């Protein structure tokens, strides 16, 4: 009993620390987004090989469930031109996160780049349900509708985009719609609003200047092109347009000086060499003109205006077989232009192929309802063939067109045209019915065709991209990463960028002044 009491007294108290259970180390679960910061860093540094290596490692660790890694890999595939593979990866992202509008926007963009515009519109509409206030979705829908030629729907979507957020690119695309419709006044109105919103945008200023130039409003054209050169003295489009205006007014030396500046920036520009060639043509340096036009034709073999000018220069040099070659090629690309058939008929007449010349004149008369040169040249051919009755009919038709032009405009007719018309009228014995009664100096005994110069009044301007950018490209304006959204490790994805047009007008038309004679 005494021993039990002794042992009870000698017992030590148990430590509180020893009573605590031993803590086990927590298991390490794989974090899907732990390498996102590194992927983001390599991507914005454009170190795509290192970026792809990290993405591969990340996808192996996460068994292909890291959405951001898949997203960036899809962006890299798109940059490398592998659009189909990028579409597949973006569709995976949309499957992993179906409520994310950015994923759907990128799927739609890939479909757009593949030319599947209807499918892209469907996906953009799905994205719009998730985010109704995204200007980019409305903008890209408008661009898709433009490619489908549904201009009214495109116009509505672009107006919605401007209502949500005003952007230069949306104004440009809206202006393109009116240009494609042929409504220059509406296009100018849109571009004026765009310039008010962004007065230092040289692309907008240049396009607006070219539109005024196309309408013959030279003062405003000079003003806007001058503003372009104020902000960007090396803007080759504005310099080329300014040189074209000087060339149109016959100041060939100053125009060539301007073109020399442009040549330093864009040496392989078809409109540049076309305009230089026509400057030499205006200076009557025909060999140099042909050399420059041949270079333009090499750079743009499908441009009918360059072929037209080559045919015109060869006609002037009396190289009728070469003229026939280039004019025939131009007709293949522009079969609805009556003046091309008229020049082809002049070449055929000088090649002594009267039957085909008549056919060409008949086609020219059918297509061109307002150019009196066509009827006058046809009348000369018929008179020389002894068909005076038909020649008289063409001469009278020419008189009707001349009278109509006199009343509707203050156009000055080419002196050679007046001379030939007077001689032919006298030969046909129309007498008092002559349109022109002005006496002619130094009459010649042989009937000649009228000039195709200054008619110019009737000629279409001959430049190389007159229709101010009719095609839109799918390239993006910039490649930015937007600021981070919620979450600590998940980075915000690079946005699906708005679709933009190709660079607009390269050059404004040049004049083509030549004197072609039918012998």
Curated annotation (Swiss-Prot):
Pfam families for this protein: TPR_11, TPR_19, TPR_8
Subcellular location: Cytoplasm, Cytoskeleton, Microtubule organizing center, Centrosome; Cell projection, Cilium membrane; Cytoplasm; Cytoplasm, Cytoskeleton, Microtubule organizing center, Centrosome, Centriolar satellite
Spans traversing the lipid bilayer: none
Keyword Transport tagged: yes
TPR repeats: from-to residues: 67-100, 101-134, 135-168, 169-201, 203-235, 237-269, 270-303, 304-337, 339-371, 379-417
GO cellular component, one term: motile cilium
InterPro entries linked: TPR-like_helical_dom_sf (IPR011990), TPR_rpt (IPR019734)
Family, as annotated: Belongs to the BBS4 family.
Subunit (UniProt): Part of BBSome complex, that contains BBS1, BBS2, BBS4, BBS5, BBS7, BBS8, BBS9 and BBIP10. Interacts with PCM1 and DCTN1. Interacts with CCDC28B. Interacts with ALDOB and C2CD3. Interacts with PKD1. Interacts with CEP290. Interacts with DLEC1.
Protein name as annotated: BBSome complex member BBS4
